[in-house]
UniProtKB/Swiss-Prot annotation:
Species of the source: Mus musculus (Mouse)
Gene label: Spmip5
Protein task: Microtubule inner protein (MIP) part of the dynein-decorated doublet microtubules (DMTs) in flagellum axoneme. May serve to reinforce and thus stabilize the microtubule structure in the sperm flagella.
UniProt xrefs under PANTHER family: CHROMOSOME 10 OPEN READING FRAME 82 (PTHR47301:SF1), HYPOTHETICAL PROTEIN LOC681006 (PTHR47301)
Disordered: annotated span: 181-201
Subunit-level organization: Microtubule inner protein component of sperm flagellar doublet microtubules.
Identification of the protein by name: Sperm-associated microtubule inner protein 5
Keywords: Cell projection, Cilium, Cytoplasm, Cytoskeleton, Flagellum, Nucleus
Record-linked Pfam families: SPMIP5
Tissues of expression: Expressed in testis (at protein level).
Source taxon at top rank: Eukaryota
Subcellular localization: Cytoplasm, Cytoskeleton, Flagellum axoneme; Cytoplasm; Nucleus
InterPro entries: SPMIP5, SPMIP5_dom
GO BP terms: flagellated sperm motility
């Protein structure tokens, strides 16, 4: 039994056919006079495409195979090591520190240092741009580490503040004499003074000033009002 022939394979087209005609929509008019040239041009172009494919297959089959530069085991080992180090689904150790120039995950669009302030990303692939940006960033970090840092006082011309010596009034209030600055600690007296001797009120040491408090430490106005009452 013979196979049925494909419809519309031979020209001319059956009169009254109103189905799809290739390239007919690109013509000036869609009349029946344009149907036969469109189908004929489509068949010729399809035949040329088939001949080109056959020629390409013949040339590929006749081309001698390339010589491998390494064995298949080496290629598999390299792929295994790469997947072991950089595959995003593998569990990594927390103590393992990956290099900064690690190849980025395909599709990752995160932050890249020095990417927007330099021209490393112009007319280059993303991996090349990432490698250049990371390298420039590492160079800047190493340069900053090697730079000699000046101290704060030398950078801003600031001199260290000298400790102030206690004034004579503070020493007098503490019962010390300015002539013996080494006995400035609390509870210490100069060697010339007797620790058992009674000490006068601190207000009496200033002859030019009058004492404004009585024995009980109250102002004179309050003490006078209390005595009159």
């Amino acid at each position: 039994m013979e196979s049925p022939k494909t419809f519309m394979r031979k020209l001319p087209i059956t009169p009254g056919y109103c189905g799809f005609i290739p390239w007919l929509s690109c013509q000036e008019s869609s009349s029946e006079d344009r149907m036969n040239p469109c189908v004929k041009a489509f068949q010729e172009r399809t035949q040329r495409y088939k001949e080109d494919q056959q020629g390409l297959n013949c040339s590929v089959a006749n081309t001698p195979p390339l010589k491998p530069i390494c064995s298949e085991d080496t290629v598999l080992w390299v792929l295994h090591e790469y997947a072991k180090k950089y595959h995003p689904l593998t569990l990594e150790c927390k103590n393992e520190k990956k290099p900064l120039q690690e190849p980025p995950i395909p599709g990752w669009a995160g932050y890249l240092p020095r990417a927007r302030v330099t021209e490393f990303g112009y007319a280059t692939r993303y991996t090349i741009m990432a490698k250049k940006c990371y390298k420039d960033f590492l160079d800047l970090v190493e340069q900053a580490k090697r730079a000699q840092l000046k101290p704060y006082e030398q950078t801003y011309d600031v001199r260290a503040a000298q400790p102030l010596s206690p004034s004579s009034k503070i020493l007098q209030l503490q019962g010390l004499s300015p002539a013996f600055p080494e006995f400035s600690g609390p509870g210490q007296t100069p060697p010339s003074e007797d620790p058992q001797a009674p000490r006068p009120c601190g207000c009496a040491q200033w002859s030019s000033q009058s004492c404004s408090r009585n024995v009980y430490g109250e102002p004179p106005s309050l003490a006078k009002a209390f005595a009159e009452s």
